[in-house]
């Protein structure tokens, strides 16, 4: 499902040589499998590397073929590499973002620069994992790496990824841990690795990691999370960085962080899309990402690259107020092209929580309480939505009704919010633990409520994420919380709303207790960054382009279901999700793949310790008389003191079970 504005382009200046498998030795006994696209010319050209764990033969092939051939056809070679232990590559995947992974990437870069078709200049790119890796490897400074493009990435693995956020345990920590375990249970392709496919597969299964269990061992911002977090030393990156995200993506905060802290050239782009490449993402509108990225590669990877500078530029889509619709394919707004950073015309407005709502007058907050039902947030969508649809946050009215809300006056003129909103608040708690969730919403005249930004805090992390401190019961504590990066125009007739809650389930695993928080008689302030000259820098952008879609035959149509149910007798709320990703035949090599993911969450009213989560994946691969299947099932439960994690992985060949392993972990909880 792509943006309706996407333009298909087939012609390129150069014929492309497509080499489906190139073997790259990164150590004595480990070879990584790669796909190489390069222009059919005799002149050496630059090369861009993307190294990720998602299987180039099938997993990302439909995306790869709508990006890499375009660059190659315009004179920039590309390598799409399977990570160690993934796809057709040798070895075992031990964890995310290890130094070993970075070493492998550096070895690939060194290999690439020495090829006769390469001019010695290498770029690195990727979405999500590949974006993280690009930033991390750039900080290692391999000589041949001259520029990167990171999409949907983070500079802080603890606070701005899927694991934790300000001390709050994200349910995606367990969900993504399940997915990564399931992903690494899959076999290599016999058509690529030959007869050793089975021994490689069984070796992977026997050494399989239950990644979530490791991540649950690190509930504070310790050295585990500091490794690979670029924010620990921004100065380590000296090459030009293009950083891209979307307002409907989790990974927006890397943009201002890199723009504010890198000493060298940085270009940031933020549009309305979710967690995807911008030319393929929704909702739109998007821009010509492939043309823009090609110009970036040419600028920094040519035989005579541009002079390194310190310029900071930012292309931003400022979205207009609209009726919340998760399924919309394009939204209203305008593109802004800022050629300086920070913006000289930035403003900061302040609104205070008062008995009548939000006011510009600095007054003490009323002594209202914040105490939300434990299932507050059940209709909120996904933490990391990938496209338009039920994953994207919809109307917030139901969640607002379970929260303590403060509304501003009806606006008589438009107000732009651009930057990271902040809230300063003083409160008391009746518990030593708990969460505070703050949402910034746009309320339309009809009463619909649109989510603009969110901030979350484990109250024991109010003084930092490394050494939690229990909340003192009944004592006033002053807090400052930064919300996520936002770009939004509140239109006349709308209202600004701040919504406060103590729960946001199932996004956030409940704290041990669901506290009653009471605002103290002190000013509670919402600070909104904006633009003084709202129309300054408005531009028209070229529409997104992409090569034609891959040759696939659909045998089973993808289908997604998402249901929230309330058991009135037991007081139980359940969320069930089933994502059938369909069954397809890859015409290029005949592989048939099928994938189904399912999730379920439940919680009982008034009992935060009743929260449960179950996840599962089923993968099937076949070709001719070869057929394999893997099934992964996991469960998360808790009590006052521990998390209980279980997982079972089964593997089948020709319908016969050939492997089974069960994991069972009891982990002391700190959050």
Indicate where each model-derived feature is located.
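C-terminal, loop-rich substrate-recognition/catalytic regions characterized by aromatic stacking residues
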Residues: 4-6, 283-652, 656-671
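N-terminal cap/lid segment of alpha/beta-hydrolase-fold proteins
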Residues: 4-42, 407, 411-413
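Cap/lid segment of the alpha/beta-hydrolase catalytic domain
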Residues: 40-113, 162, 441-446
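Accessory cap/linker subdomain of secreted extracellular hydrolases
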Residues: 64-65, 73, 139-236
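Alpha/beta-hydrolase fold nucleophile elbow
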Residues: 116-128
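Glycine-rich nucleophile elbow surrounding the catalytic serine of serine-hydrolase chemistry
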Residues: 126-136
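Conserved alpha/beta-hydrolase "acid-adjacent" motif
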Residues: 250-255
């Amino acid at each position: 499902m792509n943006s309706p504005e996407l333009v298909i382009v087939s012609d390129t200046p150069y014929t492309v040589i497509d080499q489906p498998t190139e073997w790259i030795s990164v150590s004595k006994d480990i070879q990584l499998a790669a796909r190489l696209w390069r222009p059919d010319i005799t002149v050496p050209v630059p090369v861009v590397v993307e190294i990720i764990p998602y299987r180039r033969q099938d997993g990302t092939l439909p995306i790869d073929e709508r990006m890499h051939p375009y660059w190659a056809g315009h004179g920039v070679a590309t390598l799409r590499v399977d990570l160690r232990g993934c796809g057709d590559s040798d070895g075992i995947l031990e964890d995310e973002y290890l130094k070993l992974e970075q070493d492998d990437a550096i070895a690939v870069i060194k290999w690439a620069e020495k090829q006769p078709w390469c001019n010695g200049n290498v770029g690195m790119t990727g979405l999500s994992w590949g974006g993280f890796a690009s930033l991390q490897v750039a900080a290692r400074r391999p000589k041949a790496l001259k520029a990167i493009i990171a999409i949907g990435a983070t500079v802080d693995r603890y606070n701005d990824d899927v694991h934790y956020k300000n001390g709050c345990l994200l349910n995606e920590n367990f969900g993504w841990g399940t997915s990564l375990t399931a992903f690494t249970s899959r076999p290599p392709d016999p058509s690529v690795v030959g007869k050793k496919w089975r021994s490689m597969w069984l070796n992977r299964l026997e050494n399989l990691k239950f990644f979530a269990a490791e991540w649950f061992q690190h509930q504070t911002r310790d050295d585990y999370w500091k490794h690979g977090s670029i924010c620990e030393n921004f100065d380590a990156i000296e090459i030009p960085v293009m950083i891209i995200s979307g307002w409907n993506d989790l990974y927006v905060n890397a943009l201002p962080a890199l723009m504010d802290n890198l000493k060298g050239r940085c270009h940031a782009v933020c549009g309305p899309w979710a967690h995807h490449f911008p030319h393929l993402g929704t909702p739109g509108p998007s821009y010509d990402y492939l043309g823009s990225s090609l110009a970036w590669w040419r600028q920094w990877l040519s035989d005579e690259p541009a002079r390194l500078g310190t310029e900071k530029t930012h292309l931003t889509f400022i979205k207009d107020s609209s009726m919340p619709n998760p399924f919309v394919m394009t939204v209203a707004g305008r593109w802004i092209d800022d050629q300086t950073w920070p913006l000289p015309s930035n403003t900061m407005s302040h609104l205070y929580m008062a008995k009548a709502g939000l006011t510009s007058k600095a007054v003490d907050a009323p002594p209202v309480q914040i105490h939300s039902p434990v299932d507050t947030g059940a209709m909120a969508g996904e933490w990391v939505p990938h496209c338009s649809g039920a994953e994207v946050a919809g109307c917030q009215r139901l969640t607002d009704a379970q929260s303590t809300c403060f509304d501003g006056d009806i606006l008589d003129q438009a107000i732009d919010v651009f930057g990271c909103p902040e809230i300063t608040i003083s409160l008391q708690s009746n518990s030593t633990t708990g969460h505070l969730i703050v949402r910034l919403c746009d309320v339309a005249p009809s009463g619909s409520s649109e989510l603009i930004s969110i901030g979350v805090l484990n109250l024991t992390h109010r003084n930092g994420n490394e050494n939690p401190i229990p909340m003192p019961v009944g004592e006033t504590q002053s807090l400052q919380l930064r919300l996520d990066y936002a770009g939004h125009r509140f239109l006349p007739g709308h209202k600004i709303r701040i919504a406060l809650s103590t729960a946001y389930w199932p996004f956030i695993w409940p704290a041990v207790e669901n506290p009653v928080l009471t605002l103290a008689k002190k000013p509670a302030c919402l600070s909104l960054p904006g633009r003084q000259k709202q129309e300054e820098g408005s531009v028209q952008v070229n529409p997104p382009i992409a090569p034609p879609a891959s040759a696939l035959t659909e045998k089973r149509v993808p289908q997604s279901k998402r249901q929230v149910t309330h058991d009135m007798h037991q007081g139980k709320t359940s969320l069930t999700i089933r994502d059938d990703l369909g069954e397809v035949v890859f015409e290029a090599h005949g592989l048939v793949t099928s994938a189904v993911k399912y999730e379920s969450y439940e919680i009982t009213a008034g009992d935060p310790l009743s929260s449960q989560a179950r996840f599962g994946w089923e993968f099937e691969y076949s070709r001719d008389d070869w057929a394999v299947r893997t099934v992964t099932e996991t469960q998360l439960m808790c009590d006052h003191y521990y998390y209980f994690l279980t997982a079972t992985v089964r593997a089948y060949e020709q319908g016969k079970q050939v492997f089974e392993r069960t994991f069972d972990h009891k982990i002391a909880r700190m959050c």
